[in-house]
Amino acid sequence: NVSYDPTRELYTEVNKEFGAYWKSRTGQDINFRQSHGGSGKQARAVIDGLNADVVTLALAADIDAIAEKTTLLPKDWQKKFPHNSTPYTSTIVFLVRKGNPKKIKDWGDLVKPGVEIITPNPKTSGGARWNYLAAWAWAKHQAGGNDAKAQEFVRKIYKQTKVLDSGARGSTTTFAERGIGDVLLAWENEAHLAIREQPGKFEIVTPTLSILAEPP
C-alpha cells in the first residue's frame, strides 16, 4: 500500500483487520508492506516504478497522474467504488502550543507579525495542498474577497512559514518534537495524534472556515 504521510497508524489497523477477514474467507495469509510520504512524491514514485497493489493518496489529482502516465489504473478509477472511490473525509485545523500564546483563532491571525507557521510543501504534500485551498477559500470569502486577494493572502502565509517539510508527518515532527513554529496547519488526525502523544502541550483551534478534504 503506497500511501500519503499521516496514514501509518490508520492503515496498520486497516491492514490487520483486512488480513484477518481475508484469511477467514480464503485461508490465505497476506504480507502487508506500507510506504508513506508526501502524496505528490508518492505518486511520482509509483509512476517511476515503485510497486503498489494499492495506492491511497491525499488528492484525486495524484491518482489521476498515475492513471494518465501509466497503465496501472483506468482513467475512470473514481467510478469503480462508491463516493468517487473516497473511503473517508477529513479537514484542516490549527495546532497551537498550550495556552495559545499567539492568540491564533482564525486564518487572518496567521499573517500577524511574528507568527511562525509550519506547513508542508505543496509541491510534494497532498495535505499541504488542502491547507493551501482552505486558506485561499477563507480569504476569498472575506468582505471584498477575490482571487487576487486570496493569492496575496496565501503568499503571506508562505512568507511566514518557518519550515516546509516534504510531508504532513514531517511537519508534525518539526512542530511537536523539534519545537519549531507557533502554529501547525494540520490534518485533523495529525493534530489529535500530537495531543494524544504529548498531553498538555498543545491545543486544537478550529478556524471559522476550512475545507472538506476527500482523500481517495
Enumerate the predicted regions with their spans.
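A broad detector of the eukaryotic-type serine/threonine protein kinase catalytic domain
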Residues: 99, 115, 140, 159-162
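Bilobed "Venus flytrap"/periplasmic-binding protein-like clamshell domains
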Residues: 7-13, 123-152
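N-terminal segment of the mature folded domain
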Residues: 1-124
